[in-house]
Design a protein with these regions (language model features):
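Charged (often Lys/Glu-rich) extended helix/loop segments that serve as interaction or gating elements
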Residues: 1-97
Length: 97
């Protein structure tokens, strides 16, 4: 659902896909949606594989932040990873330097 356009009429059918280059990374096909613009907030409900416990850094993708919503109030529970976070524990052997 478009969280910032909950009352907007659906004007099109769209496919909603994840951010990795796999054909199975698909949330919905032919989903009725209102007009989508840059900056809109897409809420994907019940997407456990994109939660931290099932996420991975496949294709060097940083893990998303996590937000808990309770009674209309939002709480950040995990910060988004950065690209620096992905590589800060790697060690380059001396012979490669």
């Amino acid at each position: 659902v478009l969280a910032n356009k909950m009352d907007a009429p659906n004007t099109q059918e769209v496919d909603i896909a994840g951010n990795v280059c796999e054909s199975g990374d698909l949330f919905a096909r032919d989903r009725p949606m209102p007009d989508v613009e840059e900056g809109d907030l897409l809420a994907i409900l019940n997407a456990g594989a994109y939660g931290f416990t099932m996420s991975s850094n496949y294709n060097s993708r940083p893990k998303a932040s996590e937000v808990l919503v309770k009674d209309g109030e939002c709480f950040l529970t995990r910060e988004r990873e950065t690209f620096e976070d992905l590589f800060n524990k790697q060690i380059i052997p001396d012979y490669l330097q």
